Amino acid sequence: MLSQWPRWVAQDKELPAMPIAKPLGFEVGDYVVYPKHGVGRVVELQSSEIAGSFLELFVLRFEKERMTLRVPTNKAEAVGMRKLSSQATLTEALTTLKGKPRIKRTMWSRRAQEYEAKINSGDLVSIAEVVRDLHRAEDQPEQSYSERQIYEAAIGRLARELAAMENIDEPAAQLKIEQVLKAA
């Protein structure tokens, strides 16, 4: 009767050994950026049978969120997974922070969607734009709750990538970002 079960039902059988490729140049121990979750680390390259087909997977660990994510190696590029930004991109992002904030006169709900899209794009310069636009100096009026939430998400993403790139801890990276913002 078991032979009539659908193929997707888990079976206790040994998976054949498969050579695991290193597409996109990611290796175990590398820091990577996954657009919706930020900076994570490749902790394992895994081969699994799912729905009757074999998949090679990157196993990513996001310490801040205490989350593990498995990404098929053939889908990594399509979902926007990338290596940490280059030094030139980091310099451009820090320069963006020094720029004048763009105050848009559109409804907050529309701006909030735009800011969320920029944060989830994973692009360091776009995230820096959100931080710059939502940053409030001490002499400026306070932010609304939702504005503060988006600002915290953006500065957190920026700080995590900066910390991974410069091999410093996240609070030190956040302090560096805040110093750049105050100097602007």
Predicted regions mapped to residue ranges:
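Mixed-charge, Lys/Arg-rich low-complexity intrinsically disordered regions
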Residues: 2-28
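Short, well-ordered turn and helix-capping elements at secondary-structure junctions
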Residues: 30, 44-46
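Broad gene-expression machinery/nucleic-acid interaction feature
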Residues: 37, 55-57, 68
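Short, solvent-exposed secondary-structure boundary/capping segments
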Residues: 48-59
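A short macromolecule-binding patch
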Residues: 59-61, 65-74
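Charge/polar-rich, low-complexity and marginally structured segments
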Residues: 74, 78-184
